[in-house]
UniProtKB/Swiss-Prot annotation:
Organism: Streptococcus mutans serotype c (strain ATCC 700610 / UA159)
Entry coiled-coil feature ranges: none
Gene: tyrS
UniProt-listed InterPro entries: aa-tRNA-synth_I_CS (IPR001412), aa-tRNA-synth_Ic (IPR002305), Rossmann-like_a/b/a_fold (IPR014729), S4_RNA-bd (IPR002942), S4_RNA-bd_sf (IPR036986), SYY-like_C (IPR054608), Tyr-tRNA-ligase (IPR002307), Tyr-tRNA-ligase_bac-type (IPR024088)
Residues noted as binding ATP in the record, renumbered to the chain: 232
Protein name as catalogued: Tyrosine--tRNA ligase
Keyword Protein biosynthesis: yes
Amino acid sequence: MTIFEELKARGLVFQTTDEEALKKSLDDGQVSFYTGYDPTADSLHLGHLVPILVMRHLQLAGHKPYALVGGATGLIGDPSFKDDERSLQTKETVKNWVQSIRSQLERFIDFKHGDNKAQMVNNYDWMGKITFIDFLRDVGKYFTVNYMMSKESVKKRIETGISYTEFAYQIMQGYDFYVLNQEHAVTLQVGGSDQWGNMTAGTELIRRKANKTAHVITVPLITDATGKKFGKSEGNAVWLDADKTSPYEMYQFWLNVMDADAIRFLKIFTFLSLDEIEDIRVKFEAAPHERLAQKILAKEVVTFVHGQTAYQEAVKITEQLFAGHIKSLSAKELKQGLSNVPNYAVKSNDNHNIVELLVTAGIVNSKRQAREDLQNGAIYINGERIQDLTYNLSQQDKIDNELTVIRRGKKKYFVLTY
C-alpha cells in the first residue's frame, strides 16, 4: 500500500488537486511538503491534530515536512468560514504564541534525525521584509478579483462584510506556498478542508509565476456519528497543552467516544496498522461493553500527545477515583482528576467542624441537612465515611498539605483547598 493509499484508507484525505499526479509525485521520491499553523491561541488543540498526524505519516514514509508558524498571517486573521472578523492581536502576543506552537510541534514531528528531518519556518521572516508596493506588483497582480471572490470562504462573508485585510489573507497564504516552493522546493501543502481556497491560491501563484506544478491535500473536518463537529469536551476545546487540558481530561475524552466512532477514530488518530485495527474491531464488536476500542484509542492518543508516563498517570487516576481510593493519589493527580468539580478555598478563620464546613463550603444548604447526611453515612472525607457530627478537619485530612476531597453520596465530589 502506498502512502497516499494509506492516508485514504485511514480517512485522512478529503480533497486533493490532480490526484494521479500527486500519487506519482509521492511514489517517485522524497517530496517536501508543508502545513501552516496560525497562532490564534497559546496552544494547538485537537482540531490541529489531524494535519499533524498526516505530517507524521508522510515523514515516516520518507517525505520532508516543513512546519510553518504564521507569525505574519497570525497578525491578520484567516476569514475562512468564520462568521465574524477575528480580533487583531498585538505583535508581542502573536510572537509569544508562535513560540508556544513551535515547542508543541517539536513533540510530534522529528526535527533532529535523517535527511527528511522537519524544518520550522515563520512567514514573518519574508512577509516582514516585503514592501506593500512589491507585494502588489510581484504577488497581487497574479490574482484577479473575480478569482478571489469565487472562493467559497469569501462568498460566505461578502453579504455580512469582509475587510480588505481578511480579503487579502488568501494571497498571503498563497505567497507562503510560493516562497517555500522557491526556497525549499516544497511542492505539497497539507491543511484543513476549510483551507482549500487559500491553499489553491498557492498552487495557482506557483503555476502562473514560476510555471511549476504544486499539489494540495486537505484533511476532513472530523465529526462524530451524530454529525457534530468533533474535538470539544462539554463545549470547551481539547487542548494539546497539558496545563489547559490535563492528560487525565484528554484520556476521559477519548474513553467516552461513542461506539459508532471508535474504530474510525482508531484509523484517523493512531499509528496502529490497519490490520491491527481490524483485529481490534472484531474483538470490540463481539464485546462492545468492554470498550476495548475506546481504551486503546485513549492510550494511543494520550501517549502520542503527552507521553507514556502521563498516560499511566491518567489510568491510575481513573482507576483510583472509580474505586474511591482518594488517599492513594497525590494532590497533583487529584487536581487533574477533579479539575471540574466545585472547590472551596478554606479560610484561616473558618470553623473546621464538619457540620459547619459542609455549609460554609456550599456542599449542603443547611446544618440540618449536614447532620442528616452525616448520620445517613452520605459524607466521605478522602474516601472514608464520616458520621461523627463533632468531627473537626485537621492536618491529617490535608493531602500533600494542599487539599481535602469531600464526597457527598455516590458521585458528588467537592475539593477543599488550603
